[in-house]
């Protein structure tokens, strides 16, 4: 089970100097602040400051009462002026920066734009640099060549299905599939990047996180969350999608020869029956599946088993054959396998014994179709497009520009190679020094806070401080396996990944095989603790509990998160809270089960654990009362238990970032050393108020109702509005900054706090 926690975001750059002078802004004086006021009366009027101020003012609605609805106050202008792209379920600063970074990658790989970089003569290995750029451009060209993709028809997918199911017999003795045949089929799926109802993956061993071991998890659902299988409308759409895709792939008439889109009427009863049986099987899988809350619990999901023990629990699968089938030649599993849910295996054994072989075959066929169908030409993938669009609230008639899809393929398949050029053209090295300074100040704030927490006993306090000291920062881009700054290292790293300029389907299949082989080849080897999990252009930040690392790719070090030229109160409200969020993950309901090196064991005393649980329950209750509107105007409650870790991280991150910034401000009351100057048009706001406004802007977001429902069912994060309002409700510093009366919406008497 993957235990990496993610967090993302980004911002747009506006012009128009005249817009800085907005409509009259209410004067909000800070009350009760113990820190010094900003004595530096200088207003920065550089182009960067003017742009930053304009962006903040554009997003705000100063007529709104910040004490009643802070998200409306900080983001009301954003809600009014911004629109969701026709092909997206939401619009926010994640999307803004994602698009901005993708534009940069497109200029690298799209020859038609005439902006591609020329490998520098100063590159130590110009031949490698040239080969790398060629590889990127070949992959992109294969993806953009839709006529060649269409002319290949459905044959590539049919060949893949035939290969995977070559050993599968539907004429099993006694109505049960041979366990070795099933194991080999599951191994084939895994080797090509697909996970069926069980999946094996390699990662740090929970009890010895310096070494990689095998983990066994559940999966195999085609809908985003279990709840969708109880929604009749969605189930009907899903059955229709499966039936249409079977018709597309196996029908007698090739859909590319038709002049119309395939409809329900075109689908034979045979395919409809298959679809209903496949959905029925998945519905059973969903019913025995582990709840998201328990899957995220590192104690409940840490169940070491020998191969013999697993074989006894689920004898319908030949486990030695499955395991040997996914491991490279010469690699053997020598450690216990970590099972995420023994109860799921028990339920799966019952389900497999009650499922006829033909249904199982059709289910596996559907797995291959749903995973690889998007790599076919447009007519063949249309039913899949309609399903995914509908679940996000996007019109199925909307078509995403092909280049956007192809850039996403570059980022996925050759991300670090593209990242080499990204950091050369779009990443100022000065960002690293400044952001590391911010992170260190927040770590220092935590170190100062821990001893003041009366519920944290001496033994647990000692372990917490040790873990904080051992926390590792990974910044910008990987320098190991591969070194993103080195053309030679990148060429070597991707040397075994073939790329064709003319065969997009083969490229996708080869990448799946290559990435799986790279992962399984690490079994029993030391964990690479220097590699970032994603390429540098990624707009994310991470905390990895099994390595005790906080990770900040270059892609997130942009406005509204961070800008070297922005005042500290803006950077701490943006990037500082992000950094504090990731640090807090080390001590949330999941992270606190891992020690300083990432080992799972109980280093908390029972007394401290009980106190933590009581404090955590406050967050569960608070966020569980928040709602979002569904597509028909119905209320859907946020799952306070499912989002607990992220909510603790949001609240702790805001508090510690604010305290770290205040400490710096107190050490530099002139505001000169740490750039706490004023911004044009925002002079009426105090630095503390602008800190909180900067925080909220990170979460300004417009969403379609269907998208929101999807997220609260499948995501561990709260909806964006509640990541703003829910957090400031718990902040005395916010209430003081905006003079919110006790009992007002944003300053309730009862507040939740862990860290």
Regions found by a protein language model. Give the residues of each.
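Active-site-surrounding "flap" and adjacent substrate/cofactor-binding loops of secreted or lumenal enzymes
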Residues: 44-49, 64-69, 73-151
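Noncatalytic, helix-rich "gating/capping" subdomain that lines the substrate-entry/channel surface
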Residues: 106-441, 478, 499
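Short, Gly/Pro- and small/polar-rich lid/capping loops
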Residues: 35-58
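Fungal secretory targeting signals
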Residues: 1-26
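Hydrophobic/aromatic-rich, well-ordered segments within soluble, folded domains that form packed cores
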Residues: 59-81, 227-247, 456, 644, ...
